[in-house]
Amino acid sequence: MRQLITYIIFSLSILFTVGVSAQNVTVAHEWNETLLQSIRKDFARPTVHSRNLWHTSAAMYDLWALTEDSASPYFLGNTVDGFSFPFKSFSWDEDPTVQLEEAISYAMYRILSHRFFNSPEGGFAQNRFDAKMSSLGYDITNNSEAFGNGSGAALGNYLGNLMIAYGLQDGANEAQQYQNTFYNSVNDPLVMAFSGNPDLQDPNRWQQLTLDVFIDQSGNEIPFNTPDFLSPEWGNVNHFAIPESEKQTDGNFTFFHDPGPPSLIDPNNIESSVDYKKGFGMVVQWSSHLDPTDGVMIDISPASLGNAGELPDEEQFYDYYNFFEGGDPSLGHELNPVTGQPYEPQMVPRGDYTRVLAEFWADGPDSETPPGHWFTLINYVNSHPMLEKRYEGVGPIIDDLEWDIKSYFLLGAAMHDSAVSTWGIKGYYDYLRPVSAIRYMAEKGHCTDSTRPHYDPAGMDLIDGQVELVEASDPLAGNQGQHVGKIKVKSWRGPDYINNPDNDVAGVGWILAEEWWPYQRPSFVTP
């Protein structure tokens, strides 16, 4: 996992050097933005789109590498994962710019036209690709692969079609719309509109959610309201640079960077379930931070955020995070490295900051899924007028197209390998969402005091002011006292308290724990 993080850090570190050069929008940037816009209109599939971002970035890199004596293509001319990309040579002009831009455009056009053929926006995706080609002055009917005469279009078509063929056998099951081939959930779905979680057979395993209406991350209303596990078999997809020493197999599952099993619950053993209850209990606790009117202000400037040091080992987890107040032991940074001056404080309501974080990683600027968020960030930085494009901040200025292509290659590889590793682990360990665990434990009761009502070893830990029992005089007791003795939590109150999404925030208050929701729309599968 450290190597994956290194790829991300490296791909971003080559960016953050300030200068005064003007930035041009390259053909690579144009096509990447076209891809991001198509992702925003597609089904919300982070795994699929990390792969799209990687394959398109690698194709652009390979074509650029052919123009440089010091560079080598990754796919073209090589056999990758048992798939051959035959190539010998190409006749470049003295200035290869025109041919290269043409080759990039045709390769991108072929790949995107194929990958978004079944997009939920129908023909609008293809219209977008056609329009981009037209704006660049290229003929979309040119499908020749005869690049022997130095045709950039033919070279792009050739590589684009090879990338399509490679993708049809890389383990993603693209030909069957990325459907799962062997995974099945052991639990019946949780119907979110109902209280509790009465049909959870195994409280350590993943559970589908049944929604009244399912609208995915990109705003598409899906014609079924109980979505499957997204990509639990993704560990079987060809990756870029994950060491084989990190590979694990068990039955049909392949996964990498094995972190070991998550915290589990034994419904009959409190002692062995401590970490399970603490982990999901912290989710409930931090959910109480989602009220912008609670008066809690925090500094979100670099003076207070970041510089947290080494991540904790498992046994140090609960000392690393602040269970009650939120946050980690970030020391912040004393000085701005550019100005040499301390950072100005940026005081904001904690409830605004926490909600923005949740909404960004769920929806991002325009719902291009988390892998796409990183490309949105990199495009913003790459286009900034103060960015001076030097490798690690030193040496000569790097050409805009070379800079974009190398940035995309590094970031695309990092996103794809991260997806292969992360979703492979998710699928293998098959762990449940917080909402499944919290509602399950709430329905069981509490595990704090066997002399008090609603005691059960599988129940929640009682915490004064945060997790308590409903008393007869409690507003949550119900008209007939039907909720007396149940568990209540002080938490975000949920979507029932949102009438106008533009203005309402629901706020934080006491709710029945069996009706707990994460901070999310009721039409979207929760984190």
Predicted features along the sequence, with ranges:
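Bacterial Sec-dependent N-terminal signal peptides
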Residues: 1-23
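Acidic/polar surface patches and capping/hinge elements
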Residues: 23-527
